[in-house]
From Swiss-Prot:
Function, as annotated: Core subunit of the mitochondrial membrane respiratory chain NADH dehydrogenase (Complex I) which catalyzes electron transfer from NADH through the respiratory chain, using ubiquinone as an electron acceptor. Essential for the catalytic activity of complex I.
Name of the molecule in the record: NADH-ubiquinone oxidoreductase chain 3
Top-level taxon in the UniProt lineage: Eukaryota
Species, as recorded: Osgoodomys banderanus
Upper taxonomic lineage: Eukaryota, Metazoa, Chordata, Craniata, Vertebrata
Listed EC numbers: 7.1.1.2
Key word NAD present: yes
Class of enzymatic activity (EC top level): translocase
């Protein structure tokens, strides 16, 4: 019975919050709120604006390093090593490889905004 009460209270509460979130913004409607947010771009202009290639390259580099850190850094702890020295050595090697990649990008001027 307690499980049923908790479930029904959660359903009623979430339904009320959804309805409030749906109807409350419609009470105070103005032009800026009705327009979609376009990440700093003017939504009335053309969609074919030129895109900065330097920004694109820095963004791709950030995504690559971010994914490498997110996916590879937990690896030494995930493979259940018994020796802490081996685990720390593996983590140090992974971070060193990432640091070398970052240094290579820096030397190749891949992180600079100037043309």
């Amino acid at each position: 019975m307690n499980m049923f009460m908790a479930l029904s209270v959660n359903i009623i509460l979430s339904t009320c919050l959804i309805l409030i979130a749906f109807w409350l913004p419609q009470l105070n409607l103005y032009n800026e709120k009705a327009n979609p947010y376009e990440c700093g771009f003017d939504q009335s202009s053309t969609a074919r604006l030129p895109f900065s290639m330097k920004f694109f390259l820095v963004a791709i580099t950030f995504l690559l390093f971010d994914l490498e850190i997110a996916l590879l850094l937990p690896l030494p702890w995930a493979i259940q090593m018994y020796s802490i020295n081996t685990m720390m050595l593996t983590a140090f090697i992974l971070v060193s490889i990432l640091a070398l990649g970052l240094a290579y990008e820096w030397v190749q001027k891949g992180l600079e905004w100037t043309e």
